[in-house]
A protein has these predicted regions:
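Extracytoplasmic
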Residues: 12-47, 64-68, 153-157
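Hydrophobic core of transmembrane alpha-helices in multi-pass small-molecule transporters
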Residues: 22, 91, 102-118, 143
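Small-residue-rich segments within alpha-helical transmembrane domains of MFS-like 12-TM solute carriers
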Residues: 25-29, 112-121, 150-151
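Intracellular juxtamembrane helix-capping segments at the cytosolic ends
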Residues: 39, 117-131
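Juxtamembrane helix-start elements in MFS-like secondary transporters
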Residues: 45-54, 139
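Conserved MFS/SLC helix-loop-helix module at the cytosolic interface between two early adjacent transmembrane helices
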Residues: 63-102
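Glycine-rich segments within core transmembrane alpha-helices of 12-TM secondary carriers
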Residues: 134-154
């Protein structure tokens, strides 16, 4: 039986992962909701390829999930979630500098690995490992944080584009 976790530390852990979720979802899954149309207009790439890049990122996310789970099992969630943030940042940098749609798609493959390593499933797994039978409320709170991703990030994404 897992002991009840220390409340102040637990709140810090949930808030830290929660803010990470807001940024991770907002800079990956929700990004093209705001930026696809300006990207198409400014680059001349087809909308189909821009949206397909996100789809390929999602596919990549699913494909890396078993390996991510093994790494969380072996090393814990902290290094995996941290690596996710780095991968998402690298993917976004590649995306921002993409001279053509092929590089843009490659950026989304990197982002997809970051998504697989850092969105809800790895975060929930991390909380499950940390809190055992007491993880349910932590996961609920984390989900509430993640729900603010579009509310927080869409205006930021739009502002960054202007």
């Amino acid at each position: 039986m897992t002991a009840a976790p220390d409340r102040p530390r637990r709140s810090i852990v949930i808030a830290s992962i929660g803010f990470g979720q807001i940024l991770a979802w907002g800079s990956s899954y929700y990004l093209l909701a705001v930026l696809a149309e300006p990207m198409v207009r400014e680059t001349g790439w087809s909308q189909a390829w821009v949206i397909a890049a996100l789809s390929l990122g999602l596919l990549t996310s699913g494909l890396v999930s078993p390996a991510v789970g093994r790494r969380i099992e072996r090393f814990g969630g902290r290094p995996v979630l941290a690596a996710s943030a780095v991968l998402l940042a690298i993917g976004l940098l590649i995306q921002a500098a993409a001279p053509n749609v092929a590089v843009f798609i490659a950026a989304w493959l990197v982002i997809g690995v970051g998504m697989g390593a850092g969105l809800y499933d790895p975060a929930f797994s991390t909380l499950g490992r940390l809190y055992g039978e007491h993880a349910r409320s932590a996961i609920t709170h984390l989900t509430l944080f993640g729900g603010f991703a579009s509310t927080v990030c869409w205006p930021l994404d739009r502002r960054a584009h202007v």
